[in-house]
């Protein structure tokens, strides 16, 4: 089975990376740059693809963020839930697609399925690697924004479909959630859909993460930084 490298030795050296079909919740407070961590974890390596569902940034901003990491934009797709509200006539391209708003979960689901199908058919980009099933990294940035627009029970069902889809196609999913804005019931329900949780905290301007739910990987807090799409654990 395919393993998705993370660039974090504490994970890769123990289990080779995230197993295919794994869904990971990044639980982080505001202003902790969790999106930068998430993008580093879904940066597509050679032969891989990345898809971002963006409810916070325009597609162009997401592509720029990945460009700074050195990722090949030919293998990055964005489902943009922001731009169409201000530019209703904007048209989909092969790799950048648009929905009316973060409330349009049906539209998001359709665009996601269509993009997956395009990748599987080898029509997403030139220079296809030929791996099958094609390794796909997926990110929802962010679950917090979706929860502002839809009831928890509705969003739970939506995420249940997404996580099941990622498992079926042997991809890997990263989902960002603000750890300070929601009650324990909400956090608990979202966690039920995940295989593991990466918690992030900031203390005295130093970033820490810990991994929970991956067998053999320590759950101790680790100092870290992210630069150019690479996560570095600081001794």
What residue ranges belong to the model's regions?
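Structural motif
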Residues: 25, 51, 137-140, 174
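Glycine-rich P-loop/Walker A and Walker A-like loops and their local beta1-loop-alpha1 context
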Residues: 2-65
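Short glycine-/polar-rich loops that comprise or flank the Walker A/P-loop
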Residues: 21-22, 47-49, 74, 169-171, ...
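Short acidic, S/G/P-rich loop/turn micro-motifs used as interaction or catalytic elements
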Residues: 31-33, 58, 85, 144-152, ...
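Phosphate-binding/switch region of NTP-binding enzymes
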Residues: 171, 176-235
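Substrate-engagement module of ASCE P-loop NTPases
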Residues: 150, 154-181
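Phosphate-binding/switch loop-helix module in NTP-utilizing enzymes
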Residues: 85-161
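Nucleotide-state-sensitive switch-loop elements of NTP-binding domains
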Residues: 56-59, 63-106
């Amino acid at each position: 089975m395919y393993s998705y490298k993370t660039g974090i030795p504490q994970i890769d050296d123990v289990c080779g990376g995230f197993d295919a079909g794994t869904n990971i919740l990044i639980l982080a407070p505001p202003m902790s740059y969790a999106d930068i961590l998430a993008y580093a974890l879904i940066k597509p390596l050679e032969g891989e693809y990345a898809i971002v569902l963006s409810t916070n940034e325009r597609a162009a901003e997401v592509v720029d963020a990945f460009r700074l990491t050195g990722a090949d934009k030919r293998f990055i797709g964005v489902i943009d839930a922001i731009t169409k509200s201000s530019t209703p006539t904007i048209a989909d391209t092969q790799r950048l697609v648009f929905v009316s708003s973060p409330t349009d979960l049906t539209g998001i689901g359709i665009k996601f399925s269509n993009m997956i199908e395009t990748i599987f058919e080898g029509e997403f980009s030139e220079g296809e690697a030929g791996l099958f099933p094609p390794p796909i990294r997926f990110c929802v940035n962010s679950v917090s924004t979706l929860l502002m627009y839809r009831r928890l029970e509705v969003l739970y069902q939506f995420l249940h479909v997404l996580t099941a889809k990622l498992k079926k196609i042997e991809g890997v999913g990263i989902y960002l959630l603000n750890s300070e804005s929601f009650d324990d019931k909400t956090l608990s329900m979202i966690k039920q859909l995940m295989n593991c949780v990466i918690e992030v905290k900031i203390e005295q301007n130093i970033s820490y993460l810990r991994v929970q739910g991956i067998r053999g990987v320590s759950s101790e807090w680790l100092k870290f930084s992210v630069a150019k799409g690479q996560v570095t654990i600081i001794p």
